[in-house]
């Protein structure tokens, strides 16, 4: 345990979103890791805004995925209470969670991102299929539909609308599925994702053996550099901080297309962020403590 860091950590987990079960798995792994280093842990299952944090808990380790955890809500509540927490602030979390907003900012910042538009109410999509239809504010590939024939579009939009009233149509870019962890302003080794079949959906993300991963990804030096730079640029464009994960498709013509940023990436037994950290020489407990350290020092410096 680092004596310069708070001893008592409140781990906030659960939440009301579709990603609740993944959050509980992330929290369990984080709690076990920090406990093994000697930290005192208060595990708090957050179901409403009226959660209680022990008075002597000195910082919150946020493990809530999806709405209320990654959309800026819980960060804003903690900021009002004057309680330190891990990860990005409320504003950058909100931008990253809203795909329509973040992709608009990527375009303004010169970051490659697949063409997209908000759909519904009879709006015409200004590019041809295939499309990826997705809720603007949802994570873990929940609510995503693939459309290859325009006849399938209305049904796909209807399905995605179950998860958010704002739905995007995005051009389907084919290529290598990659993800890049960002930690303390630096890009971690790139991970390549190969689902055993189909696309990297919720099932392939959280089922052991459903996907194969390569870390570091088998890319050329130039490809690796371009992917890491693009990921870091995207992270900075949204004002994110401490840590996160950037999902990218590297197309056959060498363009790294940014799909989205996860400000509270999964930390489960199948998660990619810890895999990338391990490839850089950092075990899971060290990673959790590093996130704690960066977040706490940032809070002390800026509040």
Curated annotation (Swiss-Prot):
Enzyme class (EC, first level): ligase
Binding site for Mg(2+) 2: 260, 262
Cofactor(s) recorded in Swiss-Prot or TrEMBL: Mg(2+); Mn(2+)
GO cellular component: cytoplasm
ATP-grasp domain ranges (all copies): 103-293
Subcellular locations according to the entry: Cytoplasm
PROSITE patterns documented for this protein: ATP_GRASP, DALA_DALA_LIGASE_2
Residues reported to bind Mg(2+) 1: 247, 260
Cofactor comment: Binds 2 magnesium or manganese ions per subunit.
Keyword entries, A-Z: ATP-binding, Cell shape, Cell wall biogenesis/degradation, Cytoplasm, Ligase, Magnesium, Manganese, Metal-binding, Nucleotide-binding, Peptidoglycan synthesis
Entry GO MF terms: ATP binding; D-alanine-D-alanine ligase activity; metal ion binding
Reactions the enzyme catalyzes: 2 D-alanine + ATP = D-alanyl-D-alanine + ADP + phosphate + H(+)
Similarity remark: Belongs to the D-alanine--D-alanine ligase family.
Function text: Cell wall formation.
Protein name: D-alanine--D-alanine ligase
Lineage: Bacteria, Pseudomonadati, Verrucomicrobiota, Methylacidiphilae, Methylacidiphilales
Gene symbol of the encoding locus: ddl
